[in-house]
Amino acid sequence: LETTLDVEQLLKLAELEEMRQESPDKDLEQETGRRLPKKQDKFCLAVAKDEAFCFYYQENLRAMEAEGAVVQYFSPLHDKAIPEEADGLLLGGGYPELYAKKLAENETMRTSIFQAAKRGMPIHGECGGYLYLLEQLQGEDEAYYPMCGVFSGTGIKGKRLGNFGYI
């Protein structure tokens, strides 16, 4: 690990949290016209969690709860729509390509997410969650399946695993 892990850089990145601007919310509100929820506001963060979306850092979810978010889990595979009380969506990593056919078959969920995006709901998709937000995704069977259509594009299978690393 000593030869491949830059501990000093990781510590510097961790210190960035302590160096927040005094009022980043105000800048974002002016830029987007959206008021960010305050700690006392109830903000329901709907988090996709099932066989297709299963990679989350628990400390991130705990940090969001500490900032006032109420985390509510839902399943893009098994539920018909996002939770009605959702104020924002988090679609984490996982293996949507392994479940592409089943995700595509759940048209009511895909429509629910597309409509939420169209209304301006904050949505964060990372890794597999981002792939689910695309127009279509190539499944493990190499067929192409419709996804949510929030972003234009097609997720395709590569010949090998991509690189992973720090910021």
Show which residues each predicted segment covers.
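Short, flexible hinge/linker loops that cap or flank conserved catalytic cores
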Residues: 37-39
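Short, surface-exposed amphipathic charged segments that create phosphate/polyanion-binding patches used
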Residues: 1, 86-90, 163-165
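Internal gly/pro-rich beta-alpha loop/helix module
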Residues: 1-35
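Glycine-rich, charged/polar anion/phosphate-binding loops
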Residues: 24-33, 73-78, 135
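A generic secondary-structure signal marking the coil-to-beta-strand transition
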Residues: 41-44, 147
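Phosphate-binding active sites in nucleotide-utilizing proteins
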Residues: 43-104, 111-116
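Cysteine-nucleophile active-site neighborhood
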Residues: 96-167
